[in-house]
Amino acid sequence: MSDRGRTLMVQGTTSDAGKSTLVTALCRWLARRGVAVVPFKPQNMALNSAVTADGGEIGRAQAVQAQACRLAPHTDMNPVLLKPNTDIGAQVIIHGRAVTSMDAAAYHDYKRVAMEAVLASHGRLAAAYRVVMVEGAGSPAEINLRANDIANMGFAEAVDCPVILVADIDRGGVFAHLVGTLELLSDSERERVKGFVINRFRGDIALLQPGLDWLEARTGKPVLGVLPYVSDLHLEAEDAIDTRQAAKVGPRLKVVVPVLPRISNHTDFDPLRLHPQVELSFVGPGQALPSADLIVLPGSKSVRADLAALRERGWDEAILRHLRYGGRLLGICGGLQMLGERLHDPLGLEGAAGSSAGLGLLALETTLEADKQLRNVQGRLSLEDAPLSGYEIHAGVTRGEALARPAVVLDDGRADGARSVDGNVMGTYLHGLFESTAACSALLRWAGLREVQAVDYQALRERDIERLADLVERHLDTGRLLALCGEPHA
């Protein structure tokens, strides 16, 4: 084998086919075998992001995949991140740093520049690791996106790597998805596809076998395995909000999250989804905010626009009513900014330049600035002095007298966020609060839950990554997979 590592790419017939999950599974499976493996996604479009060890920003799916590889997240793992901030545009992040915002047409022309960043990152990873496990984006068969593609076959052709194609049988039409995708590829791209993985199968595999035999005969390519449907697997969603709940018994704390048009980092709420004593509700447009113990205003990629949407839906009045009845209110990142008195965007970073009135629940004002704050932090919650870890991803600078009552004191001595005088309203810039067991328990007690069961979310995520690797061992053709990775079979 050459000094450079081997590259294997997972592409999907559709969005949500299981690419992120399969890459996570393969990464941990190889890591357990002692293989130096690293995840890579050339281009990601998502509002869920993570802060890296080198002080940049990547998609959260790649951060989970890094954990599967037993590595710290690094910006080379996701060199191009697109964070939508309007219906037709997105903030472009290259090597972890925001470069500019573009509409779709401008970005299409920019792809040649983006590809240089992609190939530079891949080259560094291939030089440092034995296997680079790559995740594609969406589908390689999107005809309108084929020109200058950097996310799927355009990348695979550029680095000359084999491809596995995964499809979700649970949504139906799996054979049409697989065969149709192949038909829409060029001859050279079709040759790169070395096998199929069918995901989320329920039932008797013997009943599926005739279809698998037909697929192999029709395409001349092997089925590398069929992964079962796993209903209780809980890893961060790349983009869509995961509303599944763990089994709940006994008294539960009611937590409501208003879903704003540009909600970001909604993975903040995954620990609450899984907590056996929390009933978590995401409330969308056209719905009234139900009665709750705690309302959480989430992060936002376009805070002033989302604040306007919140008012249009009448949720501002519902929040004030909630507080009058003794409920608790928490704002995270953009949610903190909404809690203040004014929000200023003089540079037009999130849309038209200007200022907006906040909800006026904390004596704060925020000004958006070009330099984004990206940090992994540790500190203590003002409630119960509970230790916590989290991360900052924001462009706002917040000032005001409410900061004299911080929500968090960080280990570097900085104060973060604020609390109201009556203690019913709290805001923080820190994402990931609920992942820290002690901080999560303290927040739930603050919101009214008397006897809190401690849940170790980090341990749950690690357990599920291990389960995924077990599924690879049991259900996939590991010999063929090792060959594709250039690894010995023994």
Swiss-Prot record:
Signal peptide: none annotated. Pathway: Cofactor biosynthesis; adenosylcobalamin biosynthesis. Keywords: Cobalamin biosynthesis, Glutamine amidotransferase. GO terms for biological process: cobalamin biosynthetic process. PROSITE patterns: GATASE_COBBQ. Residues 252-439 form the GATase cobBQ-type domain. The keyword Ion transport does not apply. GO terms for molecular function: ABC-type vitamin B12 transporter activity; catalytic activity. The active site is at C333 (nucleophile), H431. Belongs to the CobB/CobQ family. CobQ subfamily. PANTHER family: COBYRIC ACID SYNTHASE, DETHIOBIOTIN SYNTHETASE. Catalyzes amidations at positions B, D, E, and G on adenosylcobyrinic A,C-diamide. NH(2) groups are provided by glutamine, and one molecule of ATP is hydrogenolyzed for each amidation. This is Cobyric acid synthase. It comes from Pseudomonas aeruginosa (strain ATCC 15692 / DSM 22644 / CIP 104116 / JCM 14847 / LMG 12228 / 1C / PRS 101 / PAO1). The lineage of its organism: Bacteria, Pseudomonadati, Pseudomonadota, Gammaproteobacteria, Pseudomonadales.
